[in-house]
Amino acid sequence: MRTSHMLEQLMEALRCLPGVGPKSAQRMAFHLLQRDRKGGLQLADALSQSMTEIGHCAECRTFTEEEVCHICTNPKRQENGQICVVESPADIAAVEATGQYSGRYFVLMGHLSPLDGIGPSDIGLDVLDYRLRRGDISEVILATNPTVEGEATAHYIAELCREHQVEASRIAHGVPVGGELELVDGTTLSHSLLGRHKI
């Protein structure tokens, strides 16, 4: 079936979203045009405004409309001298949801991946190095993903911290709460055994 050029453009644009293939894009486009044109216009307006006005925090690199985000400007967040290094702004939301952390963050917007041509300056480690040199950070909590690239990135940052005499710690990895031991993969179980603590 031949569709209009504009409809094709809409479906192609929707496919830029993660997990949206041709069928899903077609379904979304038809829904917006057939049942929710007002919602479609709101979506278009919000997307347009967000793409032009949301940038990166000058301190932590998370998304914000301001020069410096609300977390970095909060004096209470600066008291303990901690920063938690994460790979994406979505990771900040996950850490914040725990209610267990009250420091500042640094967002890498990725991880080291030499095979893909992603080096230290591509993920802002030059900015992190500058922040460590300023002397207002006493501990860096490494909360990168437990992947090969995430571990390599954490190791690189730990070395940076050593150069600046700043304590570096890694979040624990292990058996999920409610998980069954026999179903846990070997790497996760190894991390759990190595990261055990006294009770």
UniProtKB/Swiss-Prot annotation:
<dbReference type="InterPro" id="IPR023627">
    <property type="entry name" value="Rcmb_RecR"/>
</dbReference>
<dbReference type="GO" id="GO:0006281">
    <property type="term" value="P:DNA repair"/>
</dbReference>
<protein>
    <recommendedName>
        <fullName>Recombination protein RecR</fullName>
    </recommendedName>
</protein>
<dbReference type="GO" id="GO:0008270">
    <property type="term" value="F:zinc ion binding"/>
</dbReference>
<keyword id="KW-0234">DNA repair</keyword>
<dbReference type="InterPro" id="IPR006171">
    <property type="entry name" value="TOPRIM_dom"/>
</dbReference>
<dbReference type="Pfam" id="PF21176">
    <property type="entry name" value="RecR_HhH"/>
</dbReference>
<dbReference type="GO" id="GO:0006310">
    <property type="term" value="P:DNA recombination"/>
</dbReference>
<dbReference type="InterPro" id="IPR015967">
    <property type="entry name" value="Rcmb_RecR_Znf"/>
</dbReference>
<keyword id="KW-0863">Zinc-finger</keyword>
<keyword id="KW-0233">DNA recombination</keyword>
<dbReference type="Pfam" id="PF13662">
    <property type="entry name" value="Toprim_4"/>
</dbReference>
<keyword id="KW-0862">Zinc</keyword>
<dbReference type="Pfam" id="PF21175">
    <property type="entry name" value="RecR_C"/>
</dbReference>
<feature type="zinc finger region" description="C4-type">
    <location>
        <begin position="57"/>
        <end position="72"/>
    </location>
</feature>
<dbReference type="Pfam" id="PF02132">
    <property type="entry name" value="RecR_ZnF"/>
</dbReference>
<comment type="function">
    <text>May play a role in DNA repair. It seems to be involved in an RecBC-independent recombinational process of DNA repair. It may act with RecF and RecO.</text>
</comment>
<dbReference type="GO" id="GO:0003677">
    <property type="term" value="F:DNA binding"/>
</dbReference>
<comment type="similarity">
    <text>Belongs to the RecR family.</text>
</comment>
<keyword id="KW-0479">Metal-binding</keyword>
<keyword id="KW-0227">DNA damage</keyword>
<feature type="domain" description="Toprim">
    <location>
        <begin position="81"/>
        <end position="176"/>
    </location>
</feature>
<dbReference type="InterPro" id="IPR000093">
    <property type="entry name" value="DNA_Rcmb_RecR"/>
</dbReference>
<dbReference type="InterPro" id="IPR034137">
    <property type="entry name" value="TOPRIM_RecR"/>
</dbReference>
